[in-house]
Amino acid sequence: NPDCLLPIKTGPCKGSFPRYAYDSSEDKCVEFIYGGCQANANNFETIEECEAACL
């Protein structure tokens, strides 16, 4: 899935939402804090969604 290779993007907004993204350097899904706007497609609400899409 090419979306999984996109960089992990917090975005410019000031929210604090736990999300998951695929980290290609670690070959796994990792948690990060999402600000709430301007996400890219490498942004999943659960680790299960991330793993289903990217692993």
Swiss-Prot record:
Gene3D superfamilies referenced in this protein's UniProt entry, alphabetically: Pancreatic trypsin inhibitor Kunitz domain
Single GO molecular function: serine-type endopeptidase inhibitor activity
Lineage: superkingdom: Eukaryota
A Pfam family matched in the record: Kunitz_BPTI
Disulfide cross-links: 4-54, 13-37, 29-50
Signal peptide region: none
Residues of the BPTI/Kunitz inhibitor domain: 4-54
Residues marked Reactive bond for trypsin (site): 14-15
Record-level GO cellular component terms: extracellular space
UniProt entry keywords in alphabetical sequence: Developmental protein, Disulfide bond, Protease inhibitor, Serine protease inhibitor
Tissues where this protein is expressed: Expressed exclusively in the middle silk gland.
CDD domains hit by this protein: Kunitz_SmCI_3-like
Further comment found in the protein's record: Has an isoelectric point of 4.3.
Role of this protein: This cocoon shell-associated protein inhibits trypsin Activity by forming a low-dissociation complex with trypsin. May play an important part in regulating proteolytic activity in the silk gland or protecting silk proteins from degradation during histolysis.
Record's subunit section: Monomer.
Protein name as annotated: Trypsin inhibitor
UniProt lineage: Eukaryota, Metazoa, Ecdysozoa, Arthropoda, Hexapoda
